[in-house]
Amino acid sequence: MNPKFIALLGSTGSIGRSTLSLVRQFPDRFKIHSLSCRRSIDKLVDQIKEFSPKQVVVEASDQVTQLRELFAESELEILSGDQGNCQLVQHPEVDLVVTGIVGSAGLSPCLKALEYGKDLVFGNKESLVLAGELFMQVAHRSGSLILPM
């Protein structure tokens, strides 16, 4: 069985850390393709070193600069903001998107993931409360699954 490649939004929060713990327990079933965080750059750096993702997303351009300096010798793609999150969830190698982003900030990348036929695991219910009907319609059209964590 081939492992599922995960795009993890909110990797440094509690949902993200729980997801990474699961990936550690089942390395033959899951691999991290991409990570995303808002502010906790130090935690993200540790996660990059451990999981070797192909892409990461941070919130601000100064954080992008900091990561590019730290990982100058790697092929890591470093993106920023909501647009970066939307870009990484649609990557062809991503099988599963796990989101721990709270509130409305996760709406755009979650919707984009569903549009691209990615299965989506919600670690929070805010996005479903805010746009659940729309998510269900898009998932039905694309064949995506929406799963609770």
What are these regions (language model features)?
Residues 1-56:
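N-terminal Rossmann-like dinucleotide-binding module
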Residues 45-49, 86, 111-112, 137:
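Alpha-helical segments flanking ligand/cofactor-binding loops in enzyme cores
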Residues 57-59, 77-84:
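Short acidic-hydrophobic, aromatic-tinged amphipathic segments that line or gate anion-handling sites
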Residues 59-60, 123-125:
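Short beta->alpha connector loops at strand-helix junctions that form conserved
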Residues 67, 104-116, 125-147:
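Rossmann-fold NAD(P)-binding glycine/threonine-rich loop
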Residues 80-112:
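Beta-loop-alpha module in the N-terminal Rossmann-like domain of NAD(P)-dependent dehydrogenases
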Residues 119-120:
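A short hydrophobic/small-residue beta-strand
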